[in-house]
UniProtKB/Swiss-Prot annotation:
Keyword Ligase: yes
Complex formation: Tetramer of two alpha and two beta subunits.
EC number: 6.1.1.20
Name this protein carries in UniProt: Phenylalanine--tRNA ligase alpha subunit
GO CC term, one of those recorded: cytoplasm
CDD domains registered for this protein in UniProt: PheRS_alpha_core
MF annotations from Gene Ontology: ATP binding; magnesium ion binding; phenylalanine-tRNA ligase activity; tRNA binding
Residues forming coiled coils: none
Amino acid sequence: MQNLKQITEQARAALDELHDKGIEALENFRVEYFGKKGHFTQLMQGLRDVLPEERPAMGAKINEAKQTVLEILNAKKEQIEQAALNVKLEQERIDVSLPGRKVEAGGLHPVSITIGRVTKFFSELGFSVESGPEIESDYYNFDALNIPKHHPARADHDTFWFNPELLLRTQTSGVQIRTMEKKQPPIRIMAPGRVYRNDYDQTHTPMFHQIELLYVDKNANFTELKGLLHDFLRAFFEEDLQVRFRPSYFPFTEPSAEVDVMGKNGKWLEVLGCGMVHPNVLRNVGIDPNEYSGFAVGMGVERLTMLRYNVTDLRSFFENDLRFLKQFK
């Protein structure tokens, strides 16, 4: 017991001398008195040499002395840490007038910008947005659109097939068919979405975006179609462009045309395709072509964007190069 009293007094005295020392000195003290070979640890180990009937009382006294010294040690540690914090706070000054870190806002992808501009224009004319599945059946992608079985668009080198009846849609025209099956004329819709074709070069990618328009009503005619597209192209390019309609062929429209605008280099540039909905397409969805007529328009979003912003390589839209994309913010 005399040894316990002596060790306790020595510990108290040592702690008093550490009032202006750092955390490292306190850690050395802890190891000296409470480590594996520390003074209090050895006292506890020495209990095995004490008579069994005296061990409980002796153990309680050692633990009491140990707890007292630990409380002083912890209090001293908190005191030193607080003093160090106060010094640090005194030395560190925060200039609240300094500007904060600049948060860089993101921007819309150029393809999204074009889709937004196109849909806004036509929505103001009463067209609503419709959507459909990207994994499409050959009926909605080809058969219902009056595309013959031998048409080259059905070939494996042009189309991604899952099996003889399912494919990744090559156009959003299937949305037109599904809409006409569900709704009765008058119908006025636009169908923006992703489409897929097996092609990859400077002006083609395996996935791209398309917007199609469909208008079905009594007495819909090509004159209305021409006027609509004239107004759209001038609004989209924000110029009074020269526009021409060239006779063309699409299985799902008759007559059909491709639309060109005059570029700044004096050359005609193709921008979209259009035509009057083929009577067979109307019959396939249960609409009488003798009573109703309609027109359809198909445009590639990336192509419109390239022409609008003078982009030379369509693949740039999908390479996630921030140097390119930041130009459209």
